[in-house]
Amino acid sequence: MDRVLVASYPINHLIRPHSFRIDYCWSTCFTSRLNSGKERQKLSSRWRWRSMASDSTDSSSSSSFAPSVESDPSDKTSASFCIIEGPETVQDFAKMELQEIQENIRSRRNKIFLHMEEVRRLRIQQRIKNAELGISKEERENELPNFPSFIPFLPPLSSENLKLYYVTCYSLIAGIILFGGLLAPTLELKLGLGGTSYEDFIRSVHLPMQLSQVDPIVASFSGGAVGVISALMVVEVNNVKQQEHKRCKYCLGTGYLACARCSNTGALVLIEPVSTLNGEHQPLSLPKTERCQNCSGSGKVMCPTCLCTGMAMASEHDPRIDPFD
């Protein structure tokens, strides 16, 4: 009976003190339940859990980084585990158990979508602040990586400046051909330099004879430079094509679509009925506008295809990266 009183003390304070009948019935039922061994084990485990919870709450008050008692133990294991810590260290997860793998997948998937939602809201606030500050020039947001140019003194590669690369490439090739085919032979003829090693070959293919006076070093330099520049241009074009394939087809890499409710203006025109009194003609008042509730005044809404990322692949279930294909 002493055990009953000690065990029932912290629970009786939740019941109103004047309800003696409820206390008596509860103590009677509690005494009968103590007779079974299974219920006694459940009770001891319950009290042990409460003591551990009280200890953990005390420790969490002293340290701000201590985990809460109500958190799932799977979150603790997933938080302490990291498959890729950095570009240098990659941990092997082949020895993990199935339950542990599922917990880590669930935890990381939730974190990914939480970060994507935070990015979406931050972008909306950024557009709202730009509209409030009167910044009308909107730069096209593109988070795809910029490929550095292989050709010196040229800006990073993108689909916008691809024409600049074509003009630069063709200009360099034309300049090298003019230098090796016309300028260098003319200078060598005037200076009395050059050799006759190519004379028979030039005569056999019916080319101008002044090409036979070209120095072999100049000829090899011109041909090699043209080949290298052509190869680099092919690499640049392939990078542009790969960048376009990674971009979302609907929003073109911006992550946003035009709001259909406000027609990309960010404001709605309030239409009020016009009433006339006694047939008098009065000038109409200016229409009133309010901020669009659909896009919060930004004029843009989230692209549902890429989930505001601008990338064509927004899910881990993409058939292009299927490891079992």
From Swiss-Prot:
Q: Where in the cell is it found?
A: Plastid, Chloroplast membrane
**Assigned keywords, A-Z:** Chloroplast, Membrane, Plastid, Repeat, Transit peptide, Transmembrane, Transmembrane helix
- Transit peptide residues are 1-54
**Where are the annotated segments for Disordered?**
53-77
Coarse class of the primary localization is plastid
Could you tell me the superkingdom of the organism this chain comes from?
Answer: Eukaryota
Q: Name a single GO cellular component.
A: chloroplast membrane
Where do transmembrane segments lie in this chain? 164-184, 217-237
Q: Does the keyword Repeat apply?
A: yes
User: CXXCXXXG motif repeats span which residues?
Assistant: 259-266, 303-310
Q: Where is the composition biased (Low complexity)?
A: 53-71
- State what this protein does: Involved in chloroplast differentiation in fruit flesh.
Spell out the family assignment given in the record's similarity comment.
Answer: Belongs to the orange-like family.
Q: What is this protein called?
A: Protein ORANGE-GREEN, chloroplastic
Q: Which organism is it from?
A: Cucumis melo
- Gene name? OR
